[in-house]
Amino acid sequence: MAYKTSLNYSPSFDSKKRKKNQIKFIIFHYTGMKSEKAAIKRLTDFKSEVSCNYLIKKNGDIVTMVPDLYISWHAGKSLWKKYQSLNKNSIGIEITNPGHRHGYNRFSNSQIRSLIKLSRSLIKKYKINLKNILGHSDIAPERKKDPGEKFPWEYLAKKNIGFW
């Protein structure tokens, strides 16, 4: 299933490329900002030192922020099984949502449709195990809540995105 993206590169990423076989995980996030505009501003501000590989906007548009073979700075201090600092082994997908601090909403149907298309493509391209599709809260539970309880994990699992 093909997906279309626009480009709005973030300056915050590791300049050294990784190998395709190093990508083992997909990590889902919500932006946690008051507005989509504020989220994009933060993700494209060098001083923020945060980024993601993809951003899915409220209307379902997918924006490439950091190309897949570059390491985006989305996971921070993180741990999953034998992996630490998951940035180097994962693709980070931010989904526009104000999050718990700013009136956490359901994710739009357009966002979920785009997330399914993008995730299926990444799973196939990088041979990602469905058990390695995680939320930020899974890999950093002491400090992160996203993508949160309104994230449709069960629905995505029925679409072969993740595990329920």
Q: Where would I find each of the regions flagged by the language model?
A:
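Conserved, mostly hydrophobic/aromatic
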Residues: F28, I93, L115
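Residues immediately flanking
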Residues: Y30, I95, S137
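Conserved beta-strand segments that form the floor/walls of ligand-binding pockets within enzyme
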Residues: L55, G92-E94, L134
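Structured loop/turn residues at beta-strand edges in well-structured enzyme cores
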Residues: N21, K88, I128
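Structural preference for beta-strand elements that scaffold enzyme active sites
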Residues: F25, S90-G92, N132
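Basic/polar, cationic surfaces and motifs that engage anionic cell-wall
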Residues: K4, Q84, P98-G99, G103-W164
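N-terminal catalytic cores of peptidoglycan-degrading enzymes
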Residues: M1-Q84
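Short coil-to-beta-strand
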Residues: Q84-I95
